[in-house]
């Protein structure tokens, strides 16, 4: 049985865990050193609901310097992973401020999975550091509410470091991409 090919693009603030999530899923190893992404591609196979799916994983740079380069990733996208870091409330604020408008402009009608990365970041040390800035880790209810607000296909939390929830993120993304094909034929991602 031939694999069904789907393109997944991951977006979100710089250093929110996008690359780690992709590397842990595709290579089953956690990168210990942070290297800012410019543009990377990975391929991974996954079976969902009895179907073999070959996911082309397109990593993107979250930093503002790449705002003009990032749209080159969007054509022919089947599903978007829109990420924030649970230990960075600011990265959640950027979901409706920056990422949703950008994605909905270039990829109208493409399903979005909202992903809370760094699930294990709710530890005591992180809480203390955030408290110094009068902040706290993102609460699951706040993230779910954000998912509803941006009309995401779903919301999941994961930890690339412990691998908790990683496979579920890509299973849900694959399901979203497979369902979307029925309605997508007239509305592919656009590059304007």
UniProtKB/Swiss-Prot annotation:
Modified-residue entries (Cysteine methyl ester), positions: 189
Protein name: Ras-like GTP-binding protein O-RHO
Alphabetized Pfam families for the sequence: Ras
PANTHER family, per the entry: RHO FAMILY GTPASE
NCBIfam families: small_GTP (TIGR00231)
Residue stretch(es) of the prosequence: 190-192
Keyword Metal-binding set for record: no
Similarity field: Belongs to the small GTPase superfamily. Rho family.
Residues anchoring lipid (S-geranylgeranyl cysteine): 189
Protein location: Cell membrane
Keywords: Cell membrane, GTP-binding, Lipoprotein, Membrane, Methylation, Nucleotide-binding, Prenylation
Superkingdom of the organism of origin: Eukaryota
Primary localization class, coarse: membrane
Entry's Gene Ontology molecular function annotations: GTP binding; GTPase activity
Motif (Effector region): 34-42
Species, as recorded: Diplobatis ommata (Ocellated electric ray)
């Amino acid at each position: 049985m031939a694999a069904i090919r789907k393109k997944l693009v991951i977006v979100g603030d710089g250093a929110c865990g996008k690359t780690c999530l992709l590397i842990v899923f595709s290579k089953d190893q956690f990168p210990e050193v942070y290297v800012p992404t410019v543009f990377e591609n990975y391929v991974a196979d996954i079976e969902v609901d009895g179907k073999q799916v070959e996911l082309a994983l397109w990593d993107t740079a979250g930093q503002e310097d790449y705002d003009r380069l990032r749209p080159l990733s969007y054509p022919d996208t089947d599903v978007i992973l829109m990420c924030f870091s649970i230990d960075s409330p600011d990265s959640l604020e950027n979901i409706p401020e920056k990422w949703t408008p950008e994605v909905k402009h270039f990829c109208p009608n493409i399903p979005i999975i909202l992903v809370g990365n760094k699930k294990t970041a709710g530890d005591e040390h992180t809480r203390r550091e955030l408290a110094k800035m009068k902040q706290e880790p993102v609460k699951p209810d706040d993230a779910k509410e954000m998912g509803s607000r941006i009309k995401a296909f779903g919301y999941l939390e994961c930890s690339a470091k412990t691998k908790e929830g990683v496979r579920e993120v890509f299973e849900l993304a694959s399901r979203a991409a497979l369902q979307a094909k029925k309605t997508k034929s007239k509305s592919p991602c656009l590059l304007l």
